[in-house]
């Protein structure tokens, strides 16, 4: 946004970058100034996004406008991946493009959503870290772009992969499906309810994901800006070959934000090592396959003793062998839940309905025998905390209570597709 190139020398030394930010976070000093001291291009354009992160109309200037879409006649080929940390923006812009462009332009355009991470959207490798997909997931994307341009500009045959407006690779089924729109990919909704249990409700003593609502004890956890145990995990490297690989970065590090964003789909540390900063729910083994295609949602009621808190939701498949595979996630600053650019502060001690309605797009067949796992936790890390200019010494910890009576049991909505 500052019309400058990415600082790959700075961004590429991930271990050093994490250490610099962690030092400032631990001291309670400005991470913005730490970034500036490390050589990052911190200017007014960057600070605009740091100081005004509220989603809403304030971000409208970065988007192409309806009249701009309506005026152009150029088709597009948009490529992203289920584990691409930029998939949210890519898909949002595609939907905006479809809504405001002419029918003729849309008819000649395509969206491809593979199983890839961000680097995979350049080269189409059929794996993300330890997660390996079937042979059809490997696509020569440079050749696809070349052949599509020849098709659009010179009338050459359309690439075989682009047989429908939207092409989705459904992991687990390991096949491509074509649909006329993203919305058409979801045929139904599977609803699950979360039930609390007595105890810490961590990964080893979790609550339940069930087929019907039921009474259970409320779940309580803490969002403490002074608790740096999650940040300490981010100082540790991922085992060689296990995390996301990029020619622009060195040894992959544990990274909360990138894990939530999808780039490290087999990393479960930020769920397993909650340390009282969140709660976990696990289902019984599925009796039938569940093909999740679309945007999940989670609706719950909570009470907080502070006017705000930052929360993350992580949805995983746990295979019969115990492997963890990310399905989707969401991040929410509770005061920004209206997405209107403003803040609606929580009333401490008052029960508030909260909807997590901006999950990442998911496209995966969860096989019978696997389990669903949902983690709700404090969203704070080296790269995302509530005090980028320095943490006040008296910054309060928030105590969050999720209600679990049957009438207000948390409700998980899973969009499903029928591929059989």
Where are these regions (language model features)?
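Short beta-strand/loop motif that positions the catalytic acidic residue
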Residues: 78-80
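A catalytic-pocket lid/entrance helix-loop region that shapes and gates access to the active site
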Residues: 1-31, 82, 101-146
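Conserved alpha/beta-hydrolase "acid-adjacent" motif
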Residues: 85-91
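Accessory cap/linker subdomain of secreted extracellular hydrolases
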Residues: 1-71
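Short, proline-enriched alpha-helix->beta-strand connector loops that line the catalytic pocket
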Residues: 70-76, 107, 187
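Active-site-adjacent bridging/hinge elements
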Residues: 52-69, 110, 114-125, 270-276, ...
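C-terminal, loop-rich substrate-recognition/catalytic regions characterized by aromatic stacking residues
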Residues: 26, 128-420
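Acidic beta-to-alpha connecting loop that harbors the catalytic carboxylate
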Residues: 82-84, 116, 197, 379
């Amino acid at each position: 946004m500052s019309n400058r190139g990415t600082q790959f020398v700075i961004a590429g030394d991930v271990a050093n970058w994490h250490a610099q930010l962690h030092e400032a976070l631990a001291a309670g000093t400005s991470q913005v100034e730490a970034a500036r001291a490390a050589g990052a291009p911190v200017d007014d354009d960057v600070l605009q996004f740091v100081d005004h992160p509220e989603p809403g109309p304030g971000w409208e200037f970065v988007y192409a406008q309806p009249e701009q879409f309506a005026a152009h006649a150029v088709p597009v080929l948009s490529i992203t991946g289920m584990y691409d940390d930029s998939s949210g923006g890519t898909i949002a812009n595609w939907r905006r493009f479809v809504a405001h462009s002419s029918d003729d332009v849309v008819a000649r355009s395509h969206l491809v959503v593979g199983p890839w991470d961000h680097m995979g959207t350049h080269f189409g490798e059929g794996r993300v870290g330890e997660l390996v997909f079937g042979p059809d997931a490997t696509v020569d994307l440079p050749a696809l772009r070349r052949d599509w341009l020849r098709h659009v500009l010179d009338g050459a045959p359309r690439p075989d992969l682009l047989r429908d407006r939207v092409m989705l690779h459904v992991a687990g089924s390991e096949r491509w499906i074509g649909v006329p729109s993203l919305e058409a990919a979801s045929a139904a909704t599977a609803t699950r309810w979360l039930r609390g249990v007595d105890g810490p409700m961590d990964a080893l003593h979790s609550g339940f994901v069930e087929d019907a609502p039921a009474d259970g004890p409320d779940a309580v956890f803490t969002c403490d800006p002074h608790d740096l145990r999650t940040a300490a995990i981010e100082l540790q490297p991922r085992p060689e070959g296990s995390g996301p690989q990029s020619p622009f970065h060195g040894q992959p590090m544990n990274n909360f934000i990138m894990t939530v964003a999808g780039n490290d789909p087999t990393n479960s540390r930020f769920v397993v090592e909650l340390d009282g900063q969140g709660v976990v729910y696990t289902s019984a083994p599925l009796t039938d396959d569940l093909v999740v295609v679309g945007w999940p949602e989670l609706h719950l009621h909570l009470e907080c003793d502070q006017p705000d808190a930052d929360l993350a939701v992580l949805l995983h498949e746990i295979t019969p062998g115990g492997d963890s595979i990310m399905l989707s996630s969401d991040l929410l600053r509770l005061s920004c839940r209206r997405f209107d650019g403003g803040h609606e502060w929580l009333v401490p001690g008052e029960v508030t309905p909260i909807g997590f309605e901006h999950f990442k797009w998911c496209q995966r067949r969860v096989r019978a025998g696997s389990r669903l796992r949902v983690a709700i936790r404090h969203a704070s890390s080296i790269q995302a905390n509530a005090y980028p200019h320095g943490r006040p010494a008296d910054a309060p910890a928030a105590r969050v209570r999720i209600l679990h009576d049957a009438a207000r049991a948390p409700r998980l909505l899973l969009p499903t597709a029928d591929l059989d």
